[in-house]
UniProtKB/Swiss-Prot annotation:
HAMAP family: Ribosomal_uL23_B. The gene is rplW. This is Large ribosomal subunit protein uL23. The keyword RNA-binding applies. NCBIfam families: PRK05738.1-3 (NF004359), PRK05738.2-4 (NF004363), PRK05738.3-2 (NF004366). The keyword Disulfide bond does not apply. Pfam families: Ribosomal_L23 (PF00276). One of the early assembly proteins it binds 23S rRNA. One of the proteins that surrounds the polypeptide exit tunnel on the outside of the ribosome. Forms the main docking site for trigger factor binding to the ribosome. Belongs to the universal ribosomal protein uL23 family. Keywords: Ribonucleoprotein, Ribosomal protein, RNA-binding, rRNA-binding. Part of the 50S ribosomal subunit. Contacts protein L29, and trigger factor when it is bound to the ribosome. One of its GO terms (molecular function) is structural constituent of ribosome.
């Protein structure tokens, strides 16, 4: 897989109270990734984009919620989330404003 496709694997970091606590304590970061991405692709993308060494990757599929759109019920899209743990001595600085 070339570098451009790897860079498109990661969509965005997931910023929440749980993900921020994991980043501070365990060097564990959470990303929203493409639904077809594998663990190896996610690991390669993080190492390429941030210049760090990845210890482990855990992925899960998040089911979309049912939401009301006016008088109709709709469904949000399903998406994939990846928990990436870094090796000791490495860190990612995510600027959150």
């Amino acid at each position: 897989m070339n570098q451009i496709e790897l860079m498109r694997t990661l969509i965005a970091p997931v910023v929440s109270e749980k993900s921020t606590a994991g980043a501070e304590k365990n060097r564990q970061f959470v990303f929203r990734v493409k639904p077809a991405a594998s663990k190896l692709q996610i690991k390669s993308a993080v190492e390429l984009m941030f210049g760090v060494k990845v210890d482990s990757v855990r992925i899960l599929n998040v089911k979309g919620k049912s939401k009301r759109f006016g008088r109709f019920m709709g469904q949000r899209s399903d998406w994939k989330k990846a928990y990436v743990k870094l090796k000791p001595g490495f860190d990612i600085e995510l600027a959150v404003n």
